[in-house]
């Protein structure tokens, strides 16, 4: 495993570590990729585009606890600030703007509901929206900012006609293949046994050790390996057909041109593979509790693939003018035919990973396969299987993108919502394109940069 503290960084508030122990799958994963001609060259944090790596986690190595945003930034000194009040269990209903028709709209207050009681709090300077990719656009639309015709259809009076709000939704859809492990091999599925679960919890509560204190995942960023030149050219032609469609929004036209170039770059991955040492059951869904419920008898690992640069796009919009109503979410995953083919080809290659000597010796000979009873090798079958099994990776992004307004953008380079003077967005909804991997670090980086921008603008005012 190649990783240096200097590359990861050690001075920030968010803690990152690899846990205190490893499973047999960690080393086998690296050896498997090496045997397939893809050794680890360097830590991806340094910019390595392709190859396997052991996945770090946002785990504090001293306490073995999650280093989440509140733990990292909401320290005791911060919570004592007199200009900070945190209210939980409240639902923001809308942003109220002044009634002037001249110039950009200015937010004057926030209306919210808590325990059935409605409240209004004044906004003397700015309103910062950090409600996430699905609810930031919902709040803008509830406040009259969005596609004017859509707002009117729900009885909302348009204030700023901004068609990009809620559009451009992107996500990394994952397809999971499950393999039964050899007798004696560890698996998270063993936690079904109350005694095993109790022992794991006891070890963790004692000193942070045991399986609950580890970072169990290993990953790889990879190009599409078994992809003959003529087939690759056909895939590019599929994208070109999209670009030739006169109805394609200018937003997607520019994005597809960029993504097409990435597909041709041998140093740029088209998918990420992840090994998770437990079973995933997409057919048991749609609830996450059922998908991760480990209800299938036996002990398994899952290998998943997710497209690094999907072309498929979805949307999220209000379902009514009622703030309590959930928005309508269209994930759009695997909507573009090029995504379907790429996902299928990467899924087929997951079977090849398990056939390497390093991985095969950890799996039960003739063991159960959760995704399909037989090896998946044909493209058409793989495409159908991907459509059946695909799940969200919960990396939703892009619904209030930082792009030019004429290209479907919602926020400017200073994070301000077009048509407003004092409303900013600080979350993953402002990504024009979803990053190729997990979005957590990028969200933290955006928030850090946003803090700098806000302070700079306040200093000028």
Residues covered by each model-derived region:
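Conserved redox-cofactor binding core of oxidoreductases
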Residues: 1-94, 98, 106-107, 177-180, ...
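Glycine-rich loop(s) and the adjacent beta-strand/alpha-helix scaffold that form part
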Residues: 94-230, 234-240, 321
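Loop/turn elements at helix/coil->beta-strand transitions in domains of secreted/extracellular proteins
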Residues: 81-85, 124-126, 421-423
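Short loop/edge segments at beta-strand edges and connector loops
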Residues: 88-90, 160-162, 404
């Amino acid at each position: 495993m190649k990783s240096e503290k200097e590359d990861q960084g050690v001075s920030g508030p968010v803690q990152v570590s690899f846990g205190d122990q490893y499973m047999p799958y960690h080393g086998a994963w690296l050896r498997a990729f090496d045997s397939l001609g893809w050794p680890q060259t360097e830590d991806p944090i340094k910019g390595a585009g392709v190859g396997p790596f052991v996945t770090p986690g946002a785990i504090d190595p001293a306490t073995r606890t999650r280093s989440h945003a509140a733990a990292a930034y909401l320290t005791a000194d911060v919570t004592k600030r007199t200009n900070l009040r945190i209210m939980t269990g409240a639902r923001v209903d809308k942003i109220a703007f002044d009634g002037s028709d001249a110039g950009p709209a200015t937010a004057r207050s926030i209306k919210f509901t808590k325990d059935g009681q409605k409240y209004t709090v004044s906004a003397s300077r700015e309103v910062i929206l950090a409600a996430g990719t699905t609810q930031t656009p919902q709040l803008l639309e509830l406040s009259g900012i969005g596609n004017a015709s859509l707002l009117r259809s729900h009885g909302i009076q348009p204030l700023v006609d901004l068609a990009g709000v809620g559009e451009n939704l992107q996500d990394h859809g994952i397809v999971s293949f499950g393999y039964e492990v050899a007798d004696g091999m560890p698996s998270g599925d063993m936690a079904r046994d109350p005694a095993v679960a109790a022992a794991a919890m006891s070890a963790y509560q004692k000193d942070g050790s045991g399986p609950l204190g580890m970072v169990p995942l290993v990953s790889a960023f990879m190009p599409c390996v078994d992809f003959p030149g003529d087939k690759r050219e056909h895939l590019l032609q599929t994208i070109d057909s999209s670009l030739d469609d006169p109805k394609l929004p200018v937003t997607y036209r520019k994005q597809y041109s960029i993504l097409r170039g990435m597909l041709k770059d041998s140093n740029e991955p088209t998918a990420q593979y992840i090994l998770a040492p437990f079973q995933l059951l997409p057919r048991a869904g749609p609830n996450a509790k059922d998908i991760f419920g480990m209800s299938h008898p036996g002990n398994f690992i899952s290998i998943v693939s997710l497209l690094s640069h999907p072309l498929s796009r979805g949307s999220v919009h209000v379902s009514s003018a009622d703030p309590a109503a959930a928005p309508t979410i269209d994930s759009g995953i695997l909507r573009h035919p090029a995504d379907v083919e790429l996902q299928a080809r990467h899924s087929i290659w997951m079977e090849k990973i398990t056939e390497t000597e390093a991985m095969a010796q950890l799996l039960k000979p003739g063991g159960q396969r959760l995704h399909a009873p037989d090896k998946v090798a044909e493209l058409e079958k793989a495409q159908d299987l991907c459509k059946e099994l695909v799940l969200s990776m919960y990396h939703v992004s892009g619904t209030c993108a930082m792009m030019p307004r004429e290209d479907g953008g919602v926020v400017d380079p200073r994070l301000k919502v077009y048509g407003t003077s004092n409303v900013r967005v600080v979350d993953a909804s402002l990504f024009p394109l979803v990053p190729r991997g997990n979005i957590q670090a990028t969200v933290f980086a955006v928030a850090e940069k946003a803090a700098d921008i806000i302070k700079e603008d306040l200093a000028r005012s």
